[in-house]
Amino acid sequence: MVLTEQKRKSLEKLSDKNGFISALAFDQRGALKRLMAQYQDTEPTVAQMEELKVLVADELTKYASSMLLDPEYGLPATKALDKEAGLLLAFEKTGYDTSSTKRLPDCLDVWSAKRIKEQGADAVKFLLYYDVDSSDELNQQKQAYIERVGSECVAEDIPFFLEILAYDEEISDAGSVEYAKVKPRKVIEAMKVFSDPRFNIDVLKVEVPVNVKYVEGFADGEVVYSKAEAADFFKAQEEATNLPYIYLSAGVSAKLFQETLQFAHDSGAKFNGVLCGRATWAGSVEPYIKEGEKAAREWLRTTGFENIDELNKVLVKTASPWTDKV
């Protein structure tokens, strides 16, 4: 992979001194509303969503190399970032049309790579739902869409992070045993597709290739993969791309995510960091809604800090610098 000088500078801004991307993800919109709604009777307000993002940015970006935010509710938080922290902004609309299994990609209406760059971002992030077994017609439509985003990022000379969420059009429950059995192929084959230089992607943000809750030694109930099988899937994922790739936390607990990173490393995965979201900050939602800003800050300074500090310690032992790949 060849980087322009500007893209290299931007990636360095998003990384720590080791060349790892230890980024805090808080571009959640629909998921944040649902989390907040658990603790109050009224619809979460824009002001509440904006304020919590500001609090998390203010309290935790001093311990992260960068932060991912959304332009809908996250712009005030971009002003609260630690001066050393890089900024990624999400380009996609939240969620997808549940009346169809197509999960078509869609950019935010009044945003572009140019506007994201003008906002001070060091990278554009775009989320794509992708089923490698969908019709060629549907997947060509999705690929063309990603080509457009990639070309915009080339024009603006800004790094393009593609987040791939694999799914199966026939299986509605991504947490099921049924999906766990097909997940490795879905994740790995999608990574192969989008490693093609035609997409102009600089970093892939991906899921781990297994549902860890069904791995021998991690599973409480049914086991879908032995430890050896799971390790082979991590190896296959490593071989699937020549691009830097980072893991998303997919809403699992902080402890399970840390254990997963260790397992990935031990299996031979040379991942280049993480974009960790709810595993770090989700616990701040309840004190924020029930008790307000002060209680949320207290949670972030204690448990939130512990989550991110533990994660950073694990990263030092498990991640590889992205500079090895460029």
Swiss-Prot record:
InterPro entries: Aldolase_TIM (IPR013785), DeoC/FbaB/LacD_aldolase (IPR002915), LacD_aldolase (IPR050552), Tag_1.6-dipho_adolase (IPR005927). Pfam families: DeoC. Pathway: Carbohydrate metabolism; D-tagatose 6-phosphate degradation; D-glyceraldehyde 3-phosphate and glycerone phosphate from D-tagatose 6-phosphate: step 2/2. The keyword Lyase applies. The keyword Nucleotide-binding does not apply. Induction: By lactose. The operon consists of lacABCDFEGX. It catalyses: D-tagatofuranose 1,6-bisphosphate = D-glyceraldehyde 3-phosphate + dihydroxyacetone phosphate. One of its GO terms (biological process) is 6-sulfoquinovose(1-) catabolic process. GO terms for molecular function: 6-deoxy-6-sulfofructose-1-phosphate aldolase activity; tagatose-6-phosphate kinase activity; tagatose-bisphosphate aldolase activity. Its EC number is 4.1.2.40. Keywords: Lactose metabolism, Lyase, Plasmid. Belongs to the aldolase LacD family. This gene was sequenced from pMG820, a laboratory-derived deletion of the naturally occurring plasmid pLP712. This is Tagatose 1,6-diphosphate aldolase. It comes from Lactococcus lactis subsp. lactis (Streptococcus lactis).
